[in-house]
Amino acid sequence: MKSSVTLLMAIHCHQPVGNFDFVFEEAFAKAYEPFLDVLERHPSVHLALHYSGCLLDWLTEHRMAFLSRVRALVARGQVEVLASGYYEPILPLIPEADRQGQIAQMRAVLRRRFHSDAEGLWLTERVWEPDLPSSLARAGIRYTIVDANQFVIAKPWLPTALQVQDESFWDLLGCYATDHAGSSVLLFPASKRLRYWMPFQPVERTLEFLKRIRRDEPVAVTFADDGEKFGLWPKTHHWVYEEGWLDQFFSALERESAWLSTNTFHEYLEAAAPNGCVYLPCGSYEEMLEWSGGSFRNFFTKYPEANAMYQMMLRISRHLQEVRSAECRVQSSMVKRRRGRTNSRLIGRATRELYAGQCNCAYWHGVFGGLYLSHLRRAVYHHLIGAEQLANEAAGQAASVSILDADGDGSEEALLNTPSMGLLIDPAEGGTVTEWNLYGPRINLLDTLSRRYEPYHEKLKAKHA
């Protein structure tokens, strides 16, 4: 007799730092709120929800009642809220101190808002690098989700019975332990098949697949994807809500409860053990690997403008860490204690600005806007420049000149700072000013972008040939 199947679902909802308010409003009205409306009507359907810090900030200001509804679902055990870096950074790309700070900020907000001590993490853009287990375990994270394609390299050593292969897809069931430097976390492989089918295929097709993966022992399969697919993407609101796809899907899960269950990831791990150990290379979901040429970091080669933003972020993070360290060395005289209180506030504000400037969306481009959207780049620069200004103020820095490799090209540049602006000058380029930040309005006057060839241009050329 075949055993049971557990469907693990994680829904990720996010809007970038600097996005237009009307986009938040539309996403809430078309996707976030109606999804919750349907979920509340199906209390036996359990899943995980992730709201990025950027979105939580907006919801706190504009839709507090919505957060209360989420908290009620968490309280009754139907929903698990997942942590992440607060402002949705690509975790492998930011310094360790910032990884810890961003995750700690998110976990603190989840405790305050939802009374939940999150142990699971939504990994931004599912960008994985092998050193992450150390950072995640140190931050109090037990498990995260990566795409099944990242496990393909380990296929020969994975349990054959938990691999599902056909002409279109390869799925991996269960969860797996991995470690780095003695720290371990659990990885759930997310199904590309389910990501492509839900919510676009009829409910019956997904149910047929779930029946097909039944084994002699209980198994679990993971679905993880963006909440915006459930209403905000073109034509999905009509299909998912007006035509009733989501309600039909949840009803089908309840109807088939004799052999099919839904759990949160936390619930699942209370009763199940890992299905083995695995060690994954750097990776992400398949489409991201296509856009980036196999490594997310290639975006910084393809787009020098993205690299300029990235290197500026790293430079400010290092500077802020130096200011923190210097502050810790201040002796405890009365005058210095007063100065220390002021500096602590400045450093705290600078840290928040830095974290907001680490929001990933403006650092890369796939098929959506990303780096090409000037308002997203402008928002990143706004926060990074604010962080630099506050760090300079905390350091008591009036004017300075520094010689450093500011753009990671192996050659030195000159960084000039005054109370009103910062200039980056590249001698190797004939003294070109490559960065010109005004602290008052918090803008980079050289924030421009060259259009480049993208693979999807071939489709346009073919269409109009």
Regions found by a protein language model. Name each.
Residues 5-96, 101-105, 119-123, 142-148, ...:
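Short, well-structured secondary-structure segments
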